[in-house]
Amino acid sequence: LENTEGSMSAQEIPLKLDGRISSYLQAYEQEDEELGRFVRLQSSCKGKLLIQKEIQQGLLHLYENGARTYFLCGETGSGKKLQCGLLCEAKKLPVLYVDSVRLMEQREPSDQICRRIKREAILKGNAAICFTGLPGDEEDRVDAQKTEKLLHGMRDWNGLLFFTSIYEWNRSIEGERKVVKVRIPDNTTEDRILLWDACLQEELRPADLNLIYLADKYRLTAGTIIDCVEEYQDRLLMKGAQPNMADLLAACTDQLEHRLGRDAVRIEAKYR
């Protein structure tokens, strides 16, 4: 893959490896008021996958210096998804892998796809999204417009964004070098509140807000709460039913009591 012209400078991050393996991460960084901070990572390895610990250290270095959008470049099988997973593991962030090819093949409108992806991201908290490639003809205007709409819809999303191909970023609509502008804000409490408020009517179901509330109240992840609800519904022979707030509270209370080994959790009456 060729460098983007002009505005990017290369910075090589040395990795301490044994003599049998030659590997490196190379980061191309750009900071722009409209784009935010992003990097392009390119990995090269002779014979073996990159050593996980060294990759993780390199990615953390970039993350701690403000990078929030990543382009993971390399040949098929070069460990691009592994690189994405390593950073998320180090920062204890859940990652949502999105198959861009399948998204483009679906007849579902781009705005609906964006709503679904953002809903997943909000439920996961400060999560990461990894787009796994987008092949095709650059001259396909319809596909390019759909791609632009999809990426523009991610502008208000909080978290980390990964692309496994620089091609997704450089697809042009007008002119030769027009890029899709996506800004990924830092995941502050204020940003999250504004995001929840903006998405409340259109992108979040009431049960989703219950999960967000419970995840904060009980310090449980949304996935753990969902597991609690499914177990609770199984006991009541209500599998598949939309859980209400009382079900959610009861399920979480049961889970916490189980963890504590005693009846140590009290729920105020107004929450039942």
Where are these regions (language model features)?
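AAA+ P-loop ATPase motor domain of ring mechanoenzymes
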Residues: S9-R107, Q112-R119, G125, G133, ...
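Conserved AAA+/SF3 P-loop NTPase catalytic/coupling segment centered on the Walker-B
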Residues: L123-L150
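A short, conserved structural fragment
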Residues: L1-S7
